[in-house]
């Protein structure tokens, strides 16, 4: 990871020679108004990665906040995702163009397949379409989300292109050790979502004990733990104060004993849908 602390997140190298901030704001389940306010607040404190999706229905709101910020496009990293209903070779290309129109952008920095939806059997063809989107300049990097080892290796084997990122549910209750290892073996960056476990660990004695030791919030400790696993991380909040606090995690480092204590919370609890059975969004 490279970069400086404080005003901006460090960046991580992707396998396609692009770089991506290690920490960014996600806007899942936020209304248009909440999205605009959250994105504006995040940009204000130096966050430069904004993660949205066609299925969230708020790409236009993200675009408005970006436009209003006046921040040069080259300084931003914008991710969107292919909705399951648009999967397919041509569908993936057309959906990327539709997302760009809603965002008011000429390209996205990262375009992901939102869910594998294996029952559909179209995720490989979809990735083929995304390769075309990258080739025509609509997406700088392409990747996947919620892909297990099976789906990830299938895409690589059948398209001969390795996704830059695999964005997955990852928090201390579901630390995804095996999948992180698989991603790393393929030089795929693991990007975590739901890193705060939907607040379920805010009052956990282990997390609170570690937080007290560093004078940090539970959320800051959970984000720091995730970052120190060499993951990129997407957090979500509609609260400007929480966004500022959650982004302020580059001035401390958890000791090995505290990393181990948080790792020990892993019990396989999944808070989001199971990629093997979920029909996608």
Swiss-Prot record:
- Enzyme Commission no: 1.1.1.-
Could you name the domain of life of the organism this protein comes from? Bacteria
The protein's matches in Pfam families, at most eight in alphabetical order, are given as: Aldo_ket_red
Q: Where is the active site?
A: 56
The answer to keyword NADP applying to this record is yes
Keyword list, A-Z: NADP, Oxidoreductase
Q: Which segments of the protein form a coiled coil according to its record?
A: none
- PANTHER family in the cross-refs: 2,5-DIKETO-D-GLUCONIC ACID REDUCTASE (PTHR43827), NADP-DEPENDENT OXIDOREDUCTASE DOMAIN-CONTAINING PROTEIN (PTHR43827:SF3)
Q: Which family does it belong to?
A: Belongs to the aldo/keto reductase family.
Name used for this protein in its record: Aldo-keto reductase MAP_3007
| The organism of origin for this protein | Mycolicibacterium paratuberculosis (strain ATCC BAA-968 / K-10)
Q: What is the lineage of its organism?
A: Bacteria, Bacillati, Actinomycetota, Actinomycetes, Mycobacteriales
């Amino acid at each position: 990871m490279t970069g400086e602390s404080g005003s901006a997140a460090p960046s991580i190298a992707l396998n396609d020679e692009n770089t991506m901030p290690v920490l960014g704001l996600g806007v899942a389940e936020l209304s248009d108004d909440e999205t605009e306010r959250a994105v504006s607040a995040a940009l204000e404190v130096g966050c430069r990665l904004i993660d949205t999706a066609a299925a969230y229905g708020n790409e236009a709101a993200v675009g408005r906040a970006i436009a209003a910020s006046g921040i040069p496009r080259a300084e931003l990293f914008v991710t969107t995702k292919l909705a399951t209903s648009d999967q397919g070779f041509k569908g993936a290309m057309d959906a990327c163009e539709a997302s760009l129109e809603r965002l008011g952008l000429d390209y996205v920095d990262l375009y992901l397949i939102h869910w594998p939806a294996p029952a559909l059997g179209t995720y490989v063809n979809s990735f083929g379409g995304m390769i075309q989107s990258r080739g025509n300049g609509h997406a700088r990097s392409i990747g996947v989300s919620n892909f297990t080892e099976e789906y990830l290796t299938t895409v690589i084997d059948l398209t001969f292109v390795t996704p830059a990122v695999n964005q997955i549910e990852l928090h201390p209750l579901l630390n995804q050790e095996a999948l992180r290892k698989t991603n790393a073996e393929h030089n795929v960056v693991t990007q975590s979502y739901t890193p705060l476990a939907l607040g379920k660990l805010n009052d956990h004695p282990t997390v609170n004990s570690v937080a007290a030791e560093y004078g940090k919030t539970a959320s800051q400790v959970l984000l720091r733990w995730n970052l120190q696993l060499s993951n990129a991380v997407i957090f979500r909040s509609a609260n400007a104060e929480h966004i500022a606090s959650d982004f302020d995690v580059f001035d401390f480092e958890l000791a090995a004993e505290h990393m181990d204590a948080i790792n020990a919370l892993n019990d396989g609890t999944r808070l989001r849908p199971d990629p093997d059975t979920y029909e996608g969004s």
